[in-house]
Regions:
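Residues that mark the start of a beta-strand
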Residues: 1-3, 123, 206-208
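Extended catalytic core of nucleotide-activated donor transferases of GT-like folds
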Residues: 4-174, 275-280, 284, 300-302
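Catalytic binding pocket for nucleotide-activated donors in carbohydrate/polymer assembly enzymes
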Residues: 7-23, 29-45, 50, 55, ...
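Hydrophobic anchor at the start of a short beta-strand
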Residues: 33-36, 124, 207, 246-248, ...
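Residues at the C-termini of beta-strands that transition into short coil/loop
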Residues: 39, 128, 164-167, 188, ...
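P-loop/Walker A phosphate-binding loop and immediately adjacent motor/lid segment at beta-alpha junctions
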Residues: 117-132, 179-198, 317-319
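Conserved catalytic-core segment of nucleotide-activated headgroup transferases in glycan assembly
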Residues: 171-290, 298
Length: 387
């Protein structure tokens, strides 16, 4: 079996991003597939230290090569098209041959342009990792009010023949993510459990999370309603540190009101410093006591069922996870190692339950990852549905 997996590892050279996309490469290879990692966004790449985009892909290319080594990917199993049009790694002709013979072209996050050279796979699947935003784009086109960027994105989406989404609750009566005219199939983040062994060392005193405060660009609009991001939801729970006897830390990027959060008792650290490489990111999560986090407002308000890729690897590390409910609690077991909350009181109660039997909930967290998120289970289902 031949599979093309796209992603944003070089475009956003940060540890958490790399683990997300390379789990597909690693997971499919472990199922016996021959996998090509392809990255071609048609745009510039991000330089996190400078906090800006650039047409210089040299440091991003070096990062990608190192990231692929972490998962033991063969040297000839990747290709990156830089902003200047140069194809690094596997050349364009070889990429075209691989794509023509592929059983599946999996466009994760819709990150890759579908150039002529990338076509010809038996199935071309779009994987929506940002539910609500994707559907807002499609809705804008349907309503005749799309920007040029939205029109381009919608046209790209419709060039696929299978459609997967992290909106796991889509189609449920209480889910407000519009289905539109596409047959969305729910999926979830795969975790290669062998890469995330249970951390048996001493755990930190702090519950942590890693997040972006507020994305740039225009906010998504669906049905005339404008939706926000994590900044909106986080402030609903700003007083949480004053209600619990444990320390809470947020590793966050963006225009964060650090002083205001610190006044409420939050420990605020820089997200990039916790995610410079895959190893640094993994170590930060594994040294945490567990995760406490909110979701983007659009995920919550639409009852999308989105579940965090980051929470998935906290669980795999044997770290209890307490995260805001987006509708995901209808699809995952809760109450042992994994807790959903909708209100401040529920968040307080969940932290108390974990602290009352911490060792039990650590073991239960890993068990949830093994049952629900193991790469073979997730990816074999995706392959069946893609076929």
């Amino acid at each position: 079996m031949r599979i093309v997996v796209t992603g944003l590892v070089a475009t956003y050279p940060m540890g958490g991003v790399s683990w997300d996309y390379l789990a597909y490469v690693d997971g499919f290879r472990r199922l016996g597939a021959e996998v090509l990692y392809l990255e071609d966004t048609g745009g510039w790449v991000y330089h996190p230290q400078a906090q800006t985009f650039s047409d210089d892909a040299a440091p991003n290319l070096r990062y990608l090569v190192e990231a692929l080594r972490v998962i033991d990917a063969p040297a000839d199993s990747w290709s990156l098209r830089a902003p200047d049009g140069v194809q690094h790694g596997l050349g364009l002709d070889a990429v075209a041959r691989f794509c023509r013979g592929a059983d599946l072209f999996l466009n994760v996050s819709g990150s890759c342009w579908l150039r002529d050279e990338y076509r010809g796979a038996r199935r071309t699947a779009y994987l929506d990792t940002d539910p609500g935003y994707t559907q807002a784009t499609l809705s804008a086109v349907a309503e005749g009010c799309a920007s040029a960027e939205q029109q381009f994105s919608a046209d790209l989406i419709r060039q696929h023949d299978r459609f997967f989404t992290f909106a796991e609750h889509i189609g449920a009566p209480d889910c407000r993510v519009p289905m539109g005219d596409l047959a969305w199939r729910p999926t979830r983040q795969p975790v290669v459990l062998e890469r995330w062994p249970v951390h048996v060392g001493p755990s930190a005193a702090r519950y942590t999370t890693v997040m972006s405060w507020k994305p740039g660009g225009a906010p998504p609009v669906i049905g005339g309603v404008t939706y926000g991001s994590k900044d909106v939801e986080f402030m609903r729970f700003a007083a949480l540190p004053q209600r619990v006897p444990v320390e809470l830390e947020v590793a966050v990027g963006g225009a964060v009101p650090r002083g205001e959060l610190a006044a409420h008792g939050w420990r605020v650290v820089d997200a990039y410093e916790c995610s410079t490489t895959m190893a640094v990111y993994q170590d930060y999560l594994r040294r945490s006591r567990g995760e406490w986090s909110v979701a983007k407002q659009i995920y919550v308000a639409l009852r999308s069922g989105w579940f965090s890729t980051r929470s998935a690897v906290y669980l795999a590390s044997g770290r209890p996870v307490i995260v805001q409910d987006t509708g995901w609690s209808a699809h995952y077991p809760t109450g042992d190692g994994l807790f959903a909350f909708r209100s401040l009181d529920e968040a307080v109660a969940a932290l108390a339950r974990v602290e009352a039997d911490y060792a039990h909930h650590c073991a239960a967290a890993r068990a949830v990852a093994e049952r629900e998120l193991a790469a073979p289970r997730v990816l074999e289902r995706l392959l069946r549905e893609a076929a």
